[in-house]
Amino acid sequence: MSDPVRVGIIDHGSGNLHSARRALRQVGAEVIVSNDPSALLDTDALVLPGVGALAVCMTGLRAMGGARLVRQWVDEGRPLLGICVGHQMLFERGRERDVDVKCLGVLPGVVEELPAERLPHMGWNTVTPATDSALFQGVQERFYFVHSYGVVVTGPHDHFTTATHQGATFVAAAEYGPVTSTQFHPEKSGIAGLALLTRWLNQLS
């Protein structure tokens, strides 16, 4: 029997740490949660969670050395999973409540308020897989979203799996080199979310 995948969850002060840790353990990962970058270096993959305001998450991440850790990690081609605001933090920048936020610049795109009459987008939604998706091809399940901001896209994309809320199509997930990220919460998406996390872990082993 092979050793479990060791996953480090970055604790920058604004994330669903308990839910993410529990879900990853359910699918067989060994999980370490830490706000010390040096404690996370000896893992097989990182998870960048995030809830609340993008600016607050970025400030917390920079303060604990996580921004430098993420960029170094991705530059080395090591696998990383962003969740919800953690997904948004991976893009170039964001604009939230008239505040411009410089993000990590790992993924191309800008986070903005979704052009929809009813916000937040909260509840279950289906996704349209990216043309070269390894994780979502053939997936019919719905995933749990709760957000008002996202990266709006038009048309099919090689790296972005999309979802639509009230006519606004946005990035629901990204698969970009070593980086995977989801706007939805896999850890709150029941069986579908656990299956997705299992597929992600299987890519690492």
Curated annotation (Swiss-Prot):
Reaction catalysis annotation: 5-[(5-phospho-1-deoxy-D-ribulos-1-ylimino)methylamino]-1-(5-phospho-beta-D-ribosyl)imidazole-4-carboxamide + L-glutamine = D-erythro-1-(imidazol-4-yl)glycerol 3-phosphate + 5-amino-1-(5-phospho-beta-D-ribosyl)imidazole-4-carboxamide + L-glutamate + H(+); L-glutamine + H2O = L-glutamate + NH4(+)
Lineage: Bacteria, Bacillati, Actinomycetota, Actinomycetes, Propionibacteriales
All copies of domain Glutamine amidotransferase type-1, residue ranges: 6-205
The protein's name: Imidazole glycerol phosphate synthase subunit HisH
GO cellular component: cytoplasm
KW Cell membrane (keyword) present: no
Subunit structure: Heterodimer of HisH and HisF.
Compartments where found: Cytoplasm
Pathway: Amino-acid biosynthesis; L-histidine biosynthesis; L-histidine from 5-phospho-alpha-D-ribose 1-diphosphate: step 5/9
Species of provenance: Cutibacterium acnes (strain DSM 16379 / KPA171202)
Name of the gene this protein is made from: hisH
Catalytic activity, EC: 4.3.2.10, 3.5.1.2
Gene Ontology MF, one: lyase activity
One Pfam family of this chain: GATase
First-listed, main subcellular location of the protein, grouped into a coarse class: cytoplasm
